[in-house]
Amino acid sequence: MHKQKTIFMFSGQGSQYYQMGQPLYAHNAVFRYWMDHLDAFCRRSWGASILELIYDPTRTRANVFERTPLSGPAIFMVEYALAKALEDAGVRADLTLGASLGTFAAAAVAGAVTPEDALTSIMRYSRVLEQHCPRGGMLAVVADCALFEAPELCSRTELAAINFASHFVVAGLEAELADVERWLGQRGIAHQRVPVSYAFHSRWIDAAREPLLRCFDELPLQPLRIPLICCAQSRTFHTWPDRAFFWNVIRDPIAFSRTIAGLVHEAPYRYLDVGPSGTLATFLRYLLPADSGALVQRVLSPFGGELQNFEAVVGAVRLGVPERV
């Protein structure tokens, strides 16, 4: 009987919240080590503490965490630290999957880039966006993806992601998004702002293309230790692609639904969400056929239970017993 392969899934902008990973930071030595280590690097490099931001005692999980220049490094730190804590406990990835910004953590865990270099690249690209791009945002819509063809949406925004049949994301400038929100609200269509400051995965970041390509070209890369699945291209990479890879990751639409459809035909994987919110695990519940044989697990959640989830995932792997979280 073949061992079920594990995919570590890393989500991107929008999955962040204050106090994310706090129970693990308090109780898991490996998670805390990597958070402290990476925060010390941020302090030395930019004079800013990401830890002080994430675990600001005046902020709760309910507060909106929208500061893009710092939310990117914060997401990366939490995802990388959680992956290392899982590895130390015996839970290892056979493949990594990255959605948008999460691809940086996926690449680091796959051995292609050091966490310090990945953090540097994330901070640089956040500053490039500030210098070259207009303020904008993203809006998640809970409706059939065909709704995007409505003139009120497609004339004002661009399709940024398709997560499953009845969940998609649009990107646009602030004024246009406000109009779209009003239009959706008038029709009783569920929607939610993604806590970002720019219209990722759309033409409104194209002004940053050349400086970002130069930024990513300076990122030292090593051969992939394990395969990396890219949701921007719905492809599994066994060798490192061209230098435009990370630009495509933040510019092209996130094709999560199509990516998973391809994986379902390969094998019944164990999908382990290593993101702060468990968002990708939630999407999978709408994508995987009932008879797929796949397992879906998460550790972190804005609703709590992180320590129990961590122990359940580790215990299931040690015992070889499938356990859903």
Q: Regions from the language model: what does each represent?
A:
Residues 121, 148, 179-180, 259:
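Hydrophobic side chains in well-ordered alpha-helices
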Residues 126-132, 155-162, 236, 262:
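Short, flexible, solvent-exposed loop/turn segments with mixed acidic/basic and small polar residues
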Residues 140, 189-274, 278, 282-283, ...:
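Acyltransferase
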